[in-house]
Amino acid sequence: MSFAANAKKELTQLELVSCCARAELSALIRMNGSLSLGNKQVGLDVTTENAAIARRIYTLIKHLYPNIHIELLVQKKMRLKKNNVYMVRISKEARQLLEDLRILNGSFQFIRDISPEIVKESCCKRAYLRGAFLAGGSINHPETSSYHLEIFSLYEEHNQAICELMNGFSLSAKTLERKKGFITYLKESEKITEFLNIIGAHQALLYFEDVRIMKDMRNSVNRLVNCETANLNKTVGAALRQVENIRFIDKTIGLENLPPKLQEVAKLRVKHQDVTLKELGEMMQGGKVSKSGINHRLRKIDEFADKLRNGTFDAKKLNTHRGK
């Protein structure tokens, strides 16, 4: 079962008071319901591929409208994924329910946004967002490369109302038009965990945070290892270059023609190719030399090698340095 499916399953098991049940059911029916007209009656079908959500819708309707007759149907998809489709059907008397949930008004007109009366209390705002997430929400698994939570709605007015409802909780949600509708989405991991807390998905929140923390730790360790590897490669590369230059000088003019201080560090570098500059400095016979001092001497050796290669080496200048 996916992370999103687990989160939704958790939400369907929450207990509700009547006002919150009404707000949640309003979102579920508005987003997953379809109307039918016949024999002067209004019928309602609410469909979902999630059995737990279908049971939730059935339970909410029974809780709020015990006198309305409900059917729970199961159909098999014959194309593509072949999942079961669960349908909660009200063949008659749906108009009363739709008006009470502020989906239709008294003139039998569809209300495209969210009625303030449905989300009057803070708990009802949370419940409506819970219903909207159950009906049209999706969330990436926290292990994936990017964090993303979204709620899909067919109507721009309703999508904007969902965004405003979310931003009432300081979530910094944004909207985007898609090919077949609109979405309200979150990209920041902290905002996603806040949203999960708001709608009551606390187990999903804890799992999300655990995975996110481990993921951040792995990324930090990888960055540290990469940095240390890069530094090590740089150090090894410099040591190999220094040894190559020292051997080139020894082959062309001989190390004995270098100033004594450079001779000593050159011989130590060839003998101890894998040690650090600090360790080289501690090996000097004339007394400990600082890391910067060793680095300066090795740079001078590199300069001598470069001049020998390009023909600009001046033996007279070398003789003036030999006693140094």
Swiss-Prot record:
* Gene3D superfamilies attached to this UniProt entry: Homing endonucleases
What's a Pfam family in this record? HTH_WhiA
DNA-binding region as annotated in the record = 276-310
Do you know which InterPro entries this protein is assigned to?
Answer: Homing_endonucl, Sporu_reg_WhiA_N_dom, Sporulation_regulator_WhiA, Sporulation_regulator_WhiA_C, WhiA_LAGLIDADG_dom
Q: Does the keyword Nucleotide-binding apply?
A: no
The protein's UniProt keywords, in alphabetical order, are:
Cell cycle, Cell division, DNA-binding
Keyword Cell cycle attached: yes
Q: What is an annotated GO biological process for this record, any one?
A: cell division
* One annotated GO molecular function: DNA binding
Tell me the function of this protein.
Answer: Involved in cell division and chromosome segregation.
Membership in a protein family? Belongs to the WhiA family.
Return the PANTHER family for the record.
Answer: CELL DIVISION PROTEIN WHIA-RELATED (PTHR37307:SF1)
The protein in question is named: Probable cell division protein WhiA
Q: Which gene encodes it?
A: whiA
